[in-house]
Structure formats: C-alpha cells, structure tokens
C-alpha cells in the first residue's frame, strides 16, 4: 500500500538502506518498476538526498531507514529539510506493536514505547504510527497532505514509523 500510494502520488525515487526493520516496505518498493530504489551508503545521505531532490525538482521523494541507529542517522537531514521548509517523507521501521517498550530490535529509549517518533516530533510537521494495515491509506494521505499542503504556512517533512505488524 505504501509503494502504491507513492507511485500514484508521482514519486519516482526512494532512498535509504535496507535493514531488518524496513524489509517489508522495501520488498513492496521492488514490486513497482516505476519506483527507483536508491541504496545509499549511510542513512543520513538518504535524508539529504530527499531534501536536495525536492529543492532541485520541487517533487518530494521518500527516505527510508531501519529501526534504532539507522533511523537516528536520518535526523540531521530531516532537520535541515524542516528548518528550510522542504517537503520530504521519512519512512522508518518500528517493532511489532506488541513488542514496543521491551527493548527489542534496537529501540532507542527503553522508557518509552516506539520511541524514535519522539525524536522526530520537533523536526517534522507530523509523525504517524499506523498500528494496523487498514490505517495505511488514511495515514498515507494525511502524511502526504501535511507535507505538500501549499495553503499551510510552510511545507515540511512527514515521518511514518512502520511497525512490523503493518
């Protein structure tokens, strides 16, 4: 559903590093030949690439990263896009909903469940964490609209934390 939405929205590129927390999303990307997957050498490069692509073309692309340290590596690029009002979508992996808060799969802050989105709250327009597949169409539309709404005071980045369950 994520890949299908991005293709319908006109996204032609996604950039990131494959990892255990984002495999299912990456597998879906590979099913869409119109979606070019760019594998970068560092997650920060994916976020900067998404930011730079929007600056050069006026078209948003998605950056993706796995759980924990991989997601944390995107912060500087996402913050740069946020400060300069550039549209980009960040997709990160997240543990199964029933595993949140159990320090599994490189959760960053063991005191809080599904905690990486807390890191991006201050550097994105909004953070979404769908917990069921049925929520994806609604969440993707909201994330895209929040990111690209030109009636808003400023464009910005959106972050989706995608659970294994989704």
Model regions and ranges:
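N-terminal alpha/beta PP-like core and its mobile active-site loop of ThDP/TPP-dependent enzymes
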Residues: 1-158, 163
């Amino acid at each position: 559903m994520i890949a299908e939405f991005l293709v319908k929205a006109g996204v032609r590129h996604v950039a990131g590093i494959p990892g255990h927390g984002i495999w299912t999303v990456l597998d879906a990307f590979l099913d869409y030949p119109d979606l070019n997957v760019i594998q970068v050498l560092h997650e920060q490069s994916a976020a900067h690439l998404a930011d730079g692509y929007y600056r050069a073309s006026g078209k948003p692309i998605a950056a993706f990263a796995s759980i924990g340290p991989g997601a944390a590596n995107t912060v500087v690029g996402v913050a740069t896009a946020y400060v300069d009002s550039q549209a980009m979508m960040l997709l990160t992996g997240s543990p199964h909903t029933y595993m949140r808060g159990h320090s599994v799969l490189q959760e960053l802050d063991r005191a809080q469940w599904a905690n990486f989105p807390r890191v991006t709250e201050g550097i994105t327009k909004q953070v979404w964490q769908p917990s069921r597949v049925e929520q994806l169409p609604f969440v993707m539309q909201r994330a895209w609209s929040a990111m690209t709404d030109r009636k808003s005071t400023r464009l910005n980045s959106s972050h989706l934390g995608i659970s294994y369950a989704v």
